[in-house]
A protein has these predicted regions:
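Active-site catalytic loop in hydrolytic enzyme cores
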Residues: 22, 31, 35, 51-125, ...
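A short C-terminal boundary segment appended to hydrolase-like catalytic domains
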Residues: 213-233
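CN hydrolase (nitrilase-like) catalytic-core segments centered on the catalytic cysteine
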Residues: 22-45, 114-205
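Residue-level detector of high-confidence beta-strand sites
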Residues: 61, 71-76, 193-202, 210-212
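Short, conserved active-site loops that position catalytic residues or coordinate cofactors/metal ions
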Residues: 1-20
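Short Pro/Gly-enriched beta-strand edge/turn motifs at strand-loop
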Residues: 43-47, 76-84, 163-165
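Short Gly/Pro-enriched turn/cap motifs at secondary-structure boundaries
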Residues: 53, 88, 173-174, 230-233
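Short beta-strand scaffold segments in enzyme catalytic cores
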Residues: 47, 61-64, 96, 162, ...
Length: 233
């Protein structure tokens, strides 16, 4: 919920209605990101946002906005107990990999990365980079996301990128604190960093993290790695 500051204007309506108020901005935000992708000739993976589908139910979704003007939606499949209790969110059903002009990618929102089966299904579809947008309020919650993300990189012989929200929002109910450290993780083998960390942001600090990844190294790993997780399952 990277756009959570917009929810402050709905505080007086209660948490369940405030999140639906935030959902009113989702289509406009998607359009703006699509315009940015075209204008700057880049592919953009948005953070997640609340979204009301045709069934009238509320979901947590995000968008891949390609530089060619097309977009795809991804959904959070597993919602947390707090998301159910406070906001009435529902788990989605879509689990897809996406083709881009850079790589075949997958996206899992926050809690979803803690379920190994999801990334395994995407790895079977040829996923090379897994992106994990997340929002965690405590270091405990952040550690769950981070440690699981690093495990997914090893298990699936892919790169994993996590990007989280930082800072405090004292005027937004149920979203007042966030803790994160964004990073780029790799498999752990000879061609990669020994600790599986390609790049890391400063803890709990707003910043831009830039990193290159070599997809050819993944192909070599699949065939010549010292261990071969994908083949040996």
């Amino acid at each position: 919920y990277f756009n959570a500051p917009l929810m402050s204007k709905y505080n007086d309506k209660g948490e369940s209605q405030a999140i639906r108020g935030l959902a009113k901005y989702t289509d406009e935000i998607r359009e703006r990101f699509m315009n940015l992708a075209i204008s700057y000739n880049i592919n953009i993976i948005t953070g997640s946002m609340p979204y009301v589908k045709e069934d009238g139910l509320l979901y947590n979704v995000g968008f891949l906005c390609r530089r060619d003007g097309t977009y795809e939606m991804y959904e959070k499949l597993h919602v947390t107990p707090d998301e159910i209790k406070s906001w009435g969110l529902n788990g989605g059903k879509l689990l897809n990999t996406f083709d881009t002009d850079c790589a075949k990618i997958g996206v899992l929102i926050c809690y979803d990365v803690e379920f190994p089966e999801l990334s395994r299904l995407m790895a079977d579809q040829g996923m090379q980079i897994l992106f994990v947008p997340f929002l965690t309020d405590t270091q405990n919650a952040y550690s769950r996301v981070r440690v699981c993300a690093q495990a997914r990189a090893i298990e699936n012989e892919c790169f994993v990128v996590i990007a989280g929200s930082v800072g405090n929002l004292p005027r937004v109910h149920n979203m007042d604190i966030q803790y994160a450290q964004s990073g780029v993780f790799t498999p752990c083998d000879f061609a990669f960093p020994t600790d599986g960390k390609r790049a890391e942001a400063t803890p709990n600090t707003e910043m831009i993290l830039v990193s290159d990844v070599d997809l050819d190294l993944l192909n070599e790993l699949h065939t010549y790695g010292s261990v071969r997780n994908l083949k040996d399952r």
